[in-house]
Amino acid sequence: MKKKMRLKVLLASTATALLLLSGCQSNQADQKVATYSGGKVTESNFYKELKQSPTTKTMLANMLIYRALNHAYGKSVSTKTVNDAYDSYKQQYGENFDAFLSQNGFSRSSFKESLRTNFLSEVALKKLKKVSESQLKAVWKTYQPKVTVQHILTSDEDTAKQVISDLAAGKDFATLAKTDSIDTATKDNGGKISFESNNKTLDATFKDAAYKLKNGDYTQTPVKVTNGYEVIKMINHPAKGTFTSSKKALTASVYAKWSRDSSIMQRVISQVLKNQHVTIKDKDLADALDSYKKPATTN
């Protein structure tokens, strides 16, 4: 299964250039960026032109958000955490990884920075917004514990139907996963994965289908997901347990839901920017963070 891209803040090198050029102007004579027959482009020329780009304010906002988050919570996100997430994507996409980066407008370094921004945002959310007992009880009503399944992802429905027929004929699920699954991250281990109800990388249709299965059962019809069709077999579906013993998992589930809520995350980022005293000095770019100053819709 391909992970859903949920990169909240995209960082662009143009924003870096914008601030660097701004600093150069205040510290030294106007330098040449380029020359041509009959003229030249100076740093001030380029800076002025750059500010007219429709995306410049967005890129500046993203850069400031990242720096504010990193200053406030950088010690809470290790390089290993970012590298592990990066390697997970790299393994998942295999030889298509560079194409994945290109399609989403990333270099390898900017993708790592975006992953770090995601982790920093999650830390900020947990620091600035707490989960109440009533919210935990609401989640408990539909909570599911960590389950382990095997799955086979196919690109078309007919292949998934054939897999189900092969299983009915007595063929081994793990063997079929190795030959028929297109999920390079799990096919070699028989398609085995474990997940909790707060998992953000799996389609809801996948999780819903899995939760309906008893140990040893598999889906009798293909399950449609974002990037194909799934056949799922339940390996371990434990009992729900008690509310008290599940509080940690319930809290994680609430935070996972909040992290996907743009209005909640807007308020969190707004508070981070306020706490870090972020101010834009250039009057032409002064409104770059205005969307974080407006009240977000309450959920």
Curated annotation (Swiss-Prot):
Lipid-binding residues (covalent, S-diacylglycerol cysteine): C24
InterPro entries documented for this protein: Foldase_PrsA (IPR023059), PPIase_dom_sf (IPR046357), PPIase_PpiC (IPR000297), PPIase_PpiC_CS (IPR023058), PrsA_foldase (IPR050245), Trigger_fact/SurA_dom_sf (IPR027304)
Gene3D superfamilies, sorted: 3.10.50.40
Gene Ontology cellular component terms for the protein in this record: plasma membrane
Lipid attachment locations (N-palmitoyl cysteine): C24
The keyword ATP-binding is assigned to this record: no
Broad enzyme group: isomerase
Superkingdom: Bacteria
Pfam families, alphabetized: Rotamase
Compartment annotation: Cell membrane
Biological processes annotated in GO: protein folding
Catalysed reactions, semicolon-separated: [protein]-peptidylproline (omega=180) = [protein]-peptidylproline (omega=0)
Similarity comment text for this entry: Belongs to the PrsA family.
Function: This protein is essential for production of active forms of the serine proteinase located in or secreted from the cell envelope.
Protein name: Foldase protein PrsA
Lineage: Bacteria, Bacillati, Bacillota, Bacilli, Lactobacillales
